[in-house]
Amino acid sequence: MKNKTEYYDQFIAKVPDFPKKGVLFYDITSVLLKPEVYTSLINEAYSFYNLKKIDCIAVVESRGYLIGAPLSLKMQLPLVLIRKEGKLPREVFGEEYELEYGFGKIEVHKDDVRMYSNILLIDDILATGGTLKSSAILLERAGGRVKDIFCFIELCGINGRRILEDYDVNSLVRYN
């Protein structure tokens, strides 16, 4: 996937010391304020994935939804939601993951993932890769195969791609 950092960087708000001191937060919600930029993001992802064998798109709560939902409509593919623990009403598979300050848990409905389906996993940002790795494990435990991972932004200096080495990982914007 072609690096589009120079173009998209001007539309991504950078918030210092959020959510805690010393962290620079890349806020993609500013991209949503420019329909032509938001459309461009979805079209870039569509162009890259349209010809790949993908059966469904899975998205990580919550900003992954902003990319995955319009892309699934454009590609006419089912959308599978990965949510934080306790947010899904039917029977679920769950997967714990480590946070800086403890542990979290994500879940997916057991009947949302078809056996052996080829899945495109989407989140807004790749930092440590922990959430995406847990999401991929969760989807595979549910019977799917994660074929690709797409993130709008990748923080290359953190090297989250390292723990995702078993997957094809693509991003449009790369920050060092």
Swiss-Prot record:
It is found in: Cytoplasm. CDD domains: PRTases_typeI (cd06223). It holds the Pfam family Pribosyltran. Coiled coil: none annotated. Keywords: Cytoplasm, Glycosyltransferase, Purine salvage, Transferase. Pathway: Purine metabolism; AMP biosynthesis via salvage pathway; AMP from adenine: step 1/1. One of its GO terms (molecular function) is adenine phosphoribosyltransferase activity. Its EC number is 2.4.2.7. Homodimer. This is Adenine phosphoribosyltransferase. It comes from Borrelia garinii subsp. bavariensis (strain ATCC BAA-2496 / DSM 23469 / PBi). The lineage of its organism: Bacteria, Pseudomonadati, Spirochaetota, Spirochaetia, Spirochaetales. The gene is apt.
